[in-house]
Curated annotation (Swiss-Prot):
It comes from the Bacteria. This is Large ribosomal subunit protein bL9. GO terms for molecular function: rRNA binding; structural constituent of ribosome. The keyword Ribosomal protein applies. The lineage of its organism: Bacteria, Pseudomonadati, Pseudomonadota, Gammaproteobacteria, Alteromonadales. Keywords: Ribonucleoprotein, Ribosomal protein, RNA-binding, rRNA-binding.
C-alpha cells in the first residue's frame, strides 16, 4: 500500500515522502494516528496544498524542543535524596520516573518517557549525566546528583 507521510516516521521517512508499506501497518498505525494518508490523486493534491502548513508545524515543534533542551542543559545539578547504606549503595534505585519528577520540580517539565537510561536504573550515590531526548532530533544532558538522606 502506498502512503504519503505527514510526519517524520522512524525507519520509514519524513514529511512528504511517498512510501510503500504493508497494508496492516498503514491501517492500524499510520492512518489512525494521522502520520500518513493513502497515496491517491485527491490526497496528493490536498497534501501539496497543506505542505507549507505541515512544514511550519514541524519547524515549530523542533524550535520548542530546542528551547526545552537549552533550559534542561542550563539547569544546575538536580539533587535527589534517597536512602543509602554506608558505602553509597542505595536501598532501591533511581529510575526514569524519579529523575523526571525531580527535574520537573526544578522548573523544567520533563516526561519519564524522555529520560534515557541505557544502563538501567541508578543504584549508587554520586553525580551522573543523564541523556534526555526531548524530540526525535534533539537531545540534552541533565546533571543529576544523588545524595544519601540524613
Amino acid at each position: 500500500m502506498n502512503v504519503i507521510l505527514l510526519d517524520k516516521v522512524a525507519n520509514l521517512g519524513s514529511l512528504g515522502d511517498q512510501v510503500s508499506v504493508k497494508a496492516g501497518y498503514a491501517r492500524n498505525f499510520l492512518l489512525p494516528y494521522g502520520k500518513a494518508v493513502v497515496a491517491n490523486a485527491a490526497n496528493t493534491e490536498v497534501f501539496e496544498a497543506r505542505r507549507a502548513e505541515l512544514e511550519a508545524k514541524l519547524a515549530a515543534e523542533l524550535a520548542t524542543a530546542t528551547a526545552r533542551a537549552d533550559k534542561l542543559t542550563a539547569l544546575e545539578a538536580v539533587v535527589i535524596a534517597s536512602k543509602a547504606g554506608d558505602e553509597g549503595k542505595l536501598f532501591g534505585s533511581i529510575g526514569n520516573r524519579d529523575i523526571a519528577d525531580a527535574v520537573t520540580a526544578a522548573g523544567v517539565a520533563l516526561a519519564k518517557s524522555e529520560v534515557r537510561l541505557p544502563l538501567g536504573a541508578l543504584r549508587t550515590t554520586g553525580s551522573f549525566e543523564i541523556e534526555v531526548q526531548v524530540h526525535a532530533e534533539v537531545k540534552a544532558v541533565v546533571k543529576i546528583a544523588i545524595v544519601a538522606e540524613a
